[in-house]
A protein has these predicted regions:
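Short, exposed beta-strand "edge-strand" segments with a Pro/Gly-rich flavor and a Y/T-containing core
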Residues: 61-63, 222-223
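Acidic catalytic cores of enzymes that act on phosphate-bearing nucleotides/polynucleotides
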Residues: 187-261, 271
């Protein structure tokens, strides 16, 4: 089959529209090989299933495990445990849309490919930028990417060994980074944006997304990010999701143009907190934002539907179950 027809079929299978419709997701994917890779996880699994990507069979003799499914450099980041009122900042996978029970080599392969694509993506951004500061920043070399890929595999094996020894478990996490580490500055920024941090009221997710000048607390009016919801529909959504959150839903908006792979999926932001709350730091940290998103089948399962009975859970439950195992 002509390659473009395979791509077309896989995009239509997942997104339920052809590229000719020019949805935002496909436009974003067309702008960069890295973005295309991020938005086409199902295509990779199709290529694995038909043998176009040749993975050594010996790797399939290893036990199945929880996998991210769409494991790439863009799906890791800093998150505070327990939302805004958590006091632990961890570095971990942060997107589980395609998580399921699967073969660990799929995550390792996908992440390794993403290292090379992200390096090229950043190189292209730098070469085509008019920003002198950006053009002068050091760029990761291909040799460094080679070293990073090998280090990633080594650390995975090391983590497996520690798990067997009992020194690594689902309560373990990356929580600190020394000054020489590439993530140190971002870790410090994350700490400042947490509740109690110097930048909590200016740079935290709550501060960026909420209108802190008005009472009661509400999401900002921002046509680029949020779509207001008709009052009756908003009331229905808040009533429907109230049993699943740990406090009162104070407001609800539809989030626009977020993500890449799931860019075309409807999603909502819920503001959750005490019924009576104001915008000062002592009370704002009692609130948090919950993302509610339409969930679809994990990408590996289109081509590998019989890996595990656990994968027969509905898509939302499977995602949550895997996230519990993978995010710590």
């Amino acid at each position: 089959m002509i390659r473009k027809n395979t791509i077309r079929e896989q995009l239509q299978l997942v997104d339920e529209v052809t590229p000719e419709h020019s949805i935002n997701k496909h436009i974003k994917m067309a702008s960069s090989p890295f973005f295309f890779f991020r938005g086409s996880a199902a295509l990779m699994y199709q290529d694995i299933a038909c043998g176009l990507i040749d993975i050594p069979q010996a790797l399939y003799t290893l036990p199945l495990t929880n996998i991210v499914g769409d494991c790439h450099t863009g799906n890791f980041g800093f998150i505070s445990e327990e939302g805004s009122h958590g006091d632990t900042l961890i570095f971990a996978p942060n997107d589980f849309d395609d998580a399921c029970i699967g073969n660990m080599i799929w995550d390792l392969f996908r992440f390794t490919v993403s290292l090379y694509l992200s390096q090229k993506h950043c190189q292209n951004l730098q070469e085509n930028s008019d920003d002198l500061k950006l053009r002068q920043k050091p760029l990761v070399t291909e040799q460094q990417v080679d070293s990073a890929a090998l280090a990633f595999f080594d650390q995975y094996l090391h983590a497996c060994a520690r798990s067997i020894e009992g020194t690594l478990n689902n309560q373990s996490a990356l929580t600190e980074f020394d000054k020489e580490h590439i993530l140190h500055k971002r870790w410090q920024k994350g700490l400042q944006r947490m509740a109690g941090g110097a930048a909590f009221l200016t740079s935290s997710t709550l501060a960026k997304e909420l209108d802190l000048t008005k009472a009661p607390l509400r999401f900002k009016t921002n046509p680029q990010r949020f779509e207001p919801i008709p009052e009756q529909h908003k009331s229905d959504l808040m009533k429907h999701f109230s049993p699943y959150v740990d406090n009162t839903i104070l407001d609800c908006v539809e989030r626009l143009n977020a993500g890449t792979g799931s860019n075309n999926m409807r999603r909502y932001y819920l503001l959750v907190g005490p019924k009576q709350v104001n915008s000062d730091a002592s009370q704002l940290n009692l609130c948090h934002i919950v993302e509610v998103k339409q969930q679809r089948r994990a990408a590996p399962l289109h081509n590998f539907p019989s890996l595990s009975p656990i994968n027969e859970l509905n898509a939302a439950h499977l995602t949550v179950n895997c996230q519990r195992k993978l995010s710590t």
